[in-house]
Every structure is written in C-alpha cells, then in structure tokens.
C-alpha cells in the first residue's frame, strides 16, 4: 500500500508497534523531522487505510480498525512495511496485526465458564498482492515474541477461513474448544490453567498460574476480585459487535418488509375468483353486505368487554409475541456468526438461557394444546364454553398455568376411567 508521504522515513523499522497514542517513532538521525502533528496525522491515515482494506478483504460492512478506535481502546497494532521495493522512494505498507487484552467468559472442555483476560487477535491483514509470501507469519511471529505469548494462549476474534488455515499451517492450531461467543480458542488454552473447578480458584486462576507454573506465564492480566457465579455472563464483547448494529436493526424493524411484488410461487388459489384478468373487482352479494352491516351494528359481547377491561397488558397474542425475545437473540447471534459452526454450541448458552428457551418452547406447545382443547377437539367438550362465559381472573392468562390445570384434570379423568375403582 502506497501513500503520498514518506512511509519509509515515518517508520524506520521494518515492524512498527503503535499503541493508543499513535506516537510517531523516533526518526533516523539525519532525516528531516516534520511537525509532530503532521507525523501523527500520517500515522492516522495509514491506520485508517489499513483498516478499510482489511474490512474489504474480510467482507465486513465497516472497518473494525481505525485511528479513532485505536485511540479509544487499549489495543496494539503491529505494522509491517516493505523494505525491498521503494515505490517513488516513499516506501510501502505490507500489512498489520492488531491485538489487545480482553476480558472474556470462555468455556473449557468441561463446559465450565471461566473468566479470563487473554491476548486476542483482533484484526490481521496482509495486502492482497503479497499474501502467501510469508509476511503474515513474519508479523505474527514478531508479535508473539514481543508479547511473550504462545499461540495456543491466544483468543481469536472471529477468525476468517484464511486465518484458520494460517494458524493451522504455521502453529499447528486445529482443534478448537467450542464457545458461545465469537472468540475462538484452541486446545491447549487451558493447558496450564486447569485447577479443581471450585469457584474460588476460578477467578484467580491466572495470577496463580503465573506464580506456580514453570512454563511461560499466560498472557493474562490480574483479574478483579471474584464475583458471584450469578454475575458471570456467558458472553464476551467482540470488537466486531458494533457491526451487528450496522447490519440489522432491532425487532420489529428487522422483520421482512411486506412483499411489494407477488411471490415467485404464489400459493394455489382455492377458487376461480379473481383469476380472470378481465373481471372487475369482485363485490360481495347483497345478503353478505347486509350481514356485515348487521355485524358492525351488533354491540360487543359482554364477555369480550369484560376481558378487555381485565386485561391491561393488551391482547394475549401480543404478549406471547413479546415473550419470544430470548429466541430472537439466539437467532441474531446465529445470523451474525461468520462461521455457523462456531455457534452450533449456542444451545449451551448457560443453564439460564437454556431453561428459558425450554420454558418458551413448552409455553408455545402448551398454548397450542390449549387451543386444541378450547376448540372442542373431542377431549373435553364441556370445557370449551365455560371459560368464555365467566370472567377469568387476571392470572388465568398464564398459559402454562392453564395447561397444567388442564393436564392435571385430564390425567385425573383418564385415571378415573381406566381404573375399576
Ligand atoms: C481475527 C482476524 O483478524 S480474522 C481476519 C484475518 N484476515 C483476513 O482474512 C484478511 C485476508 N487475508 C490476509 O490478509 C492474509 O491471508 C493473512 C493475514 C490471513 C495471512 O497472511 P499471509 O501473508 O498470506 O500468510 P503467510 O504467507 O505467512 O502464510 C500463508 C498461509 O496462510 C494461509 N493462507 C493465506 N492466504 C490464504 C488463502 N487465500 N487461502 C487459504 N489459505 C491461505 C495458508 O495456510 C497459507 O499457507 P499455504 O500458502 O501453504 O496454503
């Protein structure tokens, strides 16, 4: 990547390491030194352009690396410049690697949640013209040495297929430990961190590991004091989270727009009405119009009035719709996953979510059962009219409660009819 300024003079070393201050490195003796602010502006331009190129290469809707994001996060960026070719005497940039420590909640191979703060690979890009020339490895290797970290100790923020191949080829990283977030960790991540799974050890596992283990210290920071198990949430914020907002608005705005054009395969018509293009708009027969008018004039049924008065939260259908949120979130997390395979374990999103999901499913099937029962589907014809005739107490709208009662009653009836006493 070329720039209209002297990259070669700006970055004297082949690999330059920048933190959130984006400070220009010391220049070679003898080179003219422009104003510091200009140099920083040049660095910001390079970071912005690299971020854009990386996003394009990864088909991301927006860059996840920019000067602004660098300045507002405690990340470190390794920039590799081209020392061989010197187009127009100004040098060129080959690529970059961005890393940073992040607090994550990761699952170990026993599916226990662990609060850790590993070094994460956040963004990585080598210019298309020089990929597969060993530059990525050179940059990665430099970072490993500088950060004093082993490849298996890293967490990778949604690695691209190319990066997965890269890690496999150069570092033999293949087997992943399934996670419920977008980070990928590999077998060996917990290698020297396994301790008895007591919660008191879990929170301090890193600081202890650093003292007790002879192998290189885990790239972890000291964590805050242990929190109650309930406080630990089974997700971790990815640097790419903000992209979700850009991709899809929240419910209900994310619902598919109404079809303006007819579907490719319209459902088969049940009658010939409307099939002829010559026919004008169909009007109902006069008796139907009269019927409709009489229905409009008909006052609401007293039961309906009573139900409306005792139901402050709107219709039950509406309430049921809003209760589906956890599934919606799960669906969203799947939608945004770059690799569906990583998220196949979302069903293990912690007991709480799983239970909630199961409860939802149960509620839904329960409500369907309930409709069948109230339909008078042959099971309990005497009950179909009864609940409508009386004003139900407010809590009777709890679908699960109703169905439980119905099931108990049915169970009792069955037992009564099948047993001789
Ligand atoms: C957390 C994240 O940052 S995810 C985003 C990662 N970045 C990208 O996907 C952007 C596009 N890709 C790239 O920029 C580069 O290919 C990188 C950064 C992944 C690797 O850099 P390179 O300089 O190409 O890597 P290097 O030459 O050292 O190693 C080559 C190996 O990487 C892998 N690799 C690189 N490019 C490809 C590719 N197009 N297809 C498949 N594997 C590839 C292969 O294992 C390859 O070995 P091989 O050529 O023997 O098959």
Swiss-Prot record:
Modified residues (Phosphoserine): 272, 276, 315
Positions carrying Omega-N-methylarginine: 323
Stated name of the protein: Alpha-tubulin N-acetyltransferase 1
Gene Ontology MF terms: acetyltransferase activity; L-lysine N-acetyltransferase activity, acting on acetyl phosphate as donor; tubulin N-acetyltransferase activity
Alphabetized InterPro entries for the sequence: Atat (IPR038746), GNAT_ATAT (IPR007965)
Enzyme class: transferase
Post-translational modification: Autoacetylation strongly increases tubulin acetylation.
Effect of residue 139 to P: Loss of activity, but function in microtubule stability not affected
Sites bearing N6-acetyllysine, chain numbering: 56, 146, 233, 244
Tagged with keyword Acyltransferase: yes
Polar residues biased stretches: 342-351
Modified residues (Asymmetric dimethylarginine): 305
Consequences of knocking out this gene: Mutant mice are viable and show no overt phenotype. Drastic loss of tubulin acetylation in all tissues anlyzed, including in early embryos. In dorsal hippocampus, but not in ventral hippocampus, the dentate gyrus is slightly deformed, showing a prominent bulge in the lateral blade of the granular cell layers. In addition, the lateral ventricle appears to be dilated. Homozygous mutant males exhibit decreased fertility. Mature spermatozoa from cauda epididymis often show the presence of a cytoplasmic droplet attached to the annulus of the tail, indicative of impaired maturation.
Disordered, as annotated region: 196-235, 252-284, 342-421
Gene of this entry: Atat1
């Amino acid at each position: 990547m070329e720039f209209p300024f002297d990259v070669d003079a700006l970055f004297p070393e082949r690999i330059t390491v920048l933190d959130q201050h984006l400070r220009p490195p010391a220049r070679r003796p003898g080179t003219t030194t422009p104003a510091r602010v200009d140099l920083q502006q040049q660095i910001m331009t390079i970071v912005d352009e690299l971020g854009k190129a990386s996003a394009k290469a990864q088909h991301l809707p927006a860059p996840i690396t920019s000067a602004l994001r660098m300045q507002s996060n405690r990340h470190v960026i390794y920039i590799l410049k081209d020392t061989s070719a010197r187009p127009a005497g100004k040098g060129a940039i080959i690529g970059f690697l961005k890393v940073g420590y992040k607090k994550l909640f990761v699952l170990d191979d026993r599916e226990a949640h662990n609060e850790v703060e590993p070094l994460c690979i956040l963004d990585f890009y080598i210019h298309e013209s020089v990929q597969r020339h060993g530059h990525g490895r050179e940059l990665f290797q430099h970072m490993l040495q500088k950060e004093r970290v082993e490849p298996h100790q890293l967490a990778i923020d949604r690695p691209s297929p190319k990066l997965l191949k890269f890690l496999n080829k150069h570092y033999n990283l293949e087997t992943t430990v399934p996670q419920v977030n977008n980070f990928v960790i590999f077998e060996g991540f917990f290698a020297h961190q396994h301790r008895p799974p007591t919660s008191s050890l879990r929170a301090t596992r890193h600081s202890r590991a650093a003292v007790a283990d002879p192998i290189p210290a885990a790239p972890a920071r000291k964590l805050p004091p242990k929190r109650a198990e309930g406080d630990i949430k089974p997700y971790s914020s990815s640097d790419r989270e903000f992209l979700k907002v850009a991709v899809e608005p929240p419910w209900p705005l994310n619902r598919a727009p109404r079809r303006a054009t007819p579907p490719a395969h319209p459902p088969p018509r049940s009658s010939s009405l409307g099939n002829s293009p010559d026919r004008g708009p169909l009007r109902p027969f006069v008796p139907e119009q009269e019927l409709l008018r009489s229905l409009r004039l008909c006052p609401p049924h007293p039961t309906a009035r009573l139900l409306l008065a005792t139901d402050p939260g709107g219709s039950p259908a509406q309430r049921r719709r809003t209760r589906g949120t956890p599934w919606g979130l799960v669906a969203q997390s799947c939608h945004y996953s770059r690799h569906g395979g990583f998220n196949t374990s979302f069903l293990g999103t912690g007991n709480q979510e799983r239970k909630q999901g199961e409860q939802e499913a149960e509620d839904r099937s329960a409500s369907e059962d309930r409709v069948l029962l109230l339909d008078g589907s042959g099971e309990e014809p005497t009950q179909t009219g009864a609940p409508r005739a009386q004003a139900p107490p407010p809590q009777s709208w709890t679908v699960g409660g109703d169905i439980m009662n119905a099931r108990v009653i049915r169970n009792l009836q069955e037992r009564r009819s099948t047993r001789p006493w």
